Amino acid sequence: QGGSDVRANITTAVADDEVPGFTYRLVGHKWFCSAPMCDAFLVLAKSRGGLSCFLMPRVLSDGRHNAMHLARLKDKLGNRSNASAEIELHGALAFLVGEEGRGVRTIVDMVNCTRLDCVTGSAALMRQALVQAVHHARHRHAFGSRLVEQPLMANVLADLALESEAATSLMVRLAGAADQAEGDEQEERLRRIGTAVGKYWVCKRTPPMVAEALECLGGNGYVEESVMPRLLREAPLNSIWEGSGNVNALDVLRAAAKEPGVVDALFGELGQAAGGDRRLDDHVGALRKELDHGTDLEYRARRLVEAMALALQGSLLVRFAPTAVADAFCASRLGGDGGHAFGTLPSGVDCSAVLERAAPGL
């Protein structure tokens, strides 16, 4: 078993006599277990009180291996340096974490941390792909000049650089919210909604961005001697881990409906950039109207979360990035003056300034 419908879990937990109310024996099957070489695992299983969270050690205190059998390692598209296994539990010893029947609520803090990890990893993949593309274009000569000096390639690279900086800016802001969440209600609310927004959008944008960066290297990017194939295989993973795109988009709606203040925290964050760019202001106003229009929210969830992500990225770039970067982002992502593929930035963008910001002197 595995996947997003955690309440469909049929792995069972039976109270053990060793320490009543604390130790349990787990019986069941886990379709996906990431990093099976770890010393301990957080596991959801159904006990008498309902779905509960348990800490399951790999090795017991007396040195014996716990009753956890690795049925096989998964043959994955990418992420091969990190093992994923299918495991069977035959009465494995585990310790109750939190209250019985409140497993999802108990484990959600871990999920929020790993969702931020997914955003961080995807932003890093974007950055590495961008650096490879820019370095190649600055040193590769074709048709009488360096690739980076050719207007269309400069457009492509600058567009990739905008995507990378926007992803990194959002990731850093979410990390800051996570650091400050304890003791700061507004930061906690922003972390709650923003992490799911960032997980959806940054991870979703990584595969096409990495694919475009690979194309900048031509055939050299498609051979295994290059790092690009590995980046491309890795790129889709973070959209799947810790909830696919639909799961995170629906989680944003759930938070907005059930957790008072998260939407206000979002717009409070966006309000700090008010007046900095007309296109951003218009986008934020349209977003508020979309949220107020309460019909078909589930159907429109991806559209809404995309708009939230772009608003957050735009606001951060308007506040903290050079004018050339913020203006290019707002024009191409918020102003309706960009295309669907990378390399469709509108006229007037200072591509040289964007690229020098992204990779000075590379």
Where are the predicted features?
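Conserved catalytic-core motifs characterized by acidic clusters
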Residues: 71-73, 96-110, 135-151, 174-190, ...
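C-terminal amphipathic alpha-helical interaction region
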Residues: 259, 265, 269-362
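Alpha-helix capping/hinge segments and adjacent helical runs
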Residues: 25, 192-267, 327, 335-362
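A short core secondary-structure module
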Residues: 22-67
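A glycine-rich, basic-preceded beta-loop-alpha segment at the flavin cofactor/substrate interface
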Residues: 62-67, 71, 83-114, 131-148, ...
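C-terminal helix-coil-helix/basic helical segment that borders enzyme active sites and/or dimer interfaces
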Residues: 165-199, 214-215, 288-301, 305
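Flexible, glycine/threonine-enriched loop-and-boundary segments that flank and lead into catalytic domains
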Residues: 1-40, 188-204, 208-224
